[in-house]
Amino acid sequence: MAVIRLEDCVFMKEIKTNVMRILDKEKVEYTHHEYPHGKDAVDGVTVATLMNQNPDYVFKTLVTKGMGRDYYVFVVPVDHELDLKKCAKSVGEKSVEMIPVKDITKVTGYVRGGCSPLGMKKQFKTTFHITAESIPKIIVSAGKIGYQIDLKPEDLIRLTNGQCADIVKD
C-alpha cells in the first residue's frame, strides 16, 4: 500500500467571491460553477456550453443609465437581446442606454464578463426577464470571470429587491 505524505499534496484553495459570501451570510443555498477562461470575457452562450448548462437558465447582467442619471440593472437569458424601450418602460424612464464598457467597474465594482446582479457597489433597481419566474434555477456570474453560481430565482430576486418584466427583443 502506498503512503501519501501530506507535504507532497497540492491543495486547491476554494475561491469565495463577495457574491458567495453574501449568499452564505444570508443562508441561501447555491451551487458554484467554474469554467475555463482567459483574462477576457466570453459571451454567455459560450459560458453555458463550457459549463454544460441549459442557456435558458444562464443569465447575463447588463447595466444601463436612464435620462435622470439613475443606473438600472437588467438580468436576461444569455441567448436573448435586451430591448431598451421595454427596459425603460419597466423602470418608469423615457429611455435607458447601456453604460460604456469602460464605466462598468467604476459603477458596479465588477469587470466586464464578471458582473453579478448581487453585491454591486450600490444597490440599483434590478429587473429580471419574466422567464426567471418559471425556471427551477438561475445561473449568474459569481462576480468574477470564470465563476458562476446557480440558485433559486426567487432567492436572487428577493436579495436584489428585483422585479420581473418582459425586457428582451421579440
Task: State where each predicted segment sits.
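Extended, low-hydrophobicity, polar/charged segments
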Residues: A2-D170
